[in-house]
Swiss-Prot record:
One of its GO terms (molecular function) is pyridoxine 5'-phosphate synthase activity. This is Pyridoxine 5'-phosphate synthase. Its EC number is 2.6.99.2. Keywords: Cytoplasm, Pyridoxine biosynthesis, Transferase. It comes from Chlorobium chlorochromatii (strain CaD3). The keyword Transferase applies.
Amino acid sequence: MRLAVNIDHVATLRNARGEFHPDPVEAALIAEQAGAAGIVCHLREDRRHIKDDDLRRLRAAVTTKLDLEMAMTEELQAIALATKPELITLVPEKREELTTEGGFDIVRHFDTLKAYLQPFRSAGIEVSLFIEPDKQAIELAAQAGADIVELHTGLYALKAGEAQEEELTRIGNAAAFARNIGLKVVAGHGLNYSNIAPFRNIVEIEEVSIGHAIITRAIFSGLEGAVREMVALIR
């Protein structure tokens, strides 16, 4: 299983002072050096953490894989096509939320989704949809032309005991179903050093996307050490 590191919260910390440090690009390079297989950033409509210039510099610097998380808007479509990350991930977005709170509503957007994704496919940019671990959502993602589904693990992260085991089973079943219909499978949201280990047993999940847990651990142990620790946990 591979690790993709989300560096949004490095930008959040920088923006708290309105200055230049810590630099999310430097964080991305350290994460790659420590074993990350990809870098994730979310260019939100309100630009609350990652800025347009960050995205340009990340594109120039990242040598593994750049995954641009984005809302389904014409503005961000144009930016993504101009930037050419290896991968874009469509996520839901609400201005009032602190972080992404759930999966992309594929049922609501399905009628326009295929046309929206076509330019990315033509440009050779892989497309991922951040969705709930739900069979209908996975089927619609495949029909819309997605290459990858990122299964939302937020509920798993919030639960404990038997309820968490049930959610893990739901995620595992969803991953198997997605793989069987030809989709690549990744997972993310709320994963941390305490709850990640069971995902090593879900062989269909190729990659996990983790940000907040790594950045908070890095405050105490350093970023390179925090990334190396997570890489070791998922191998």
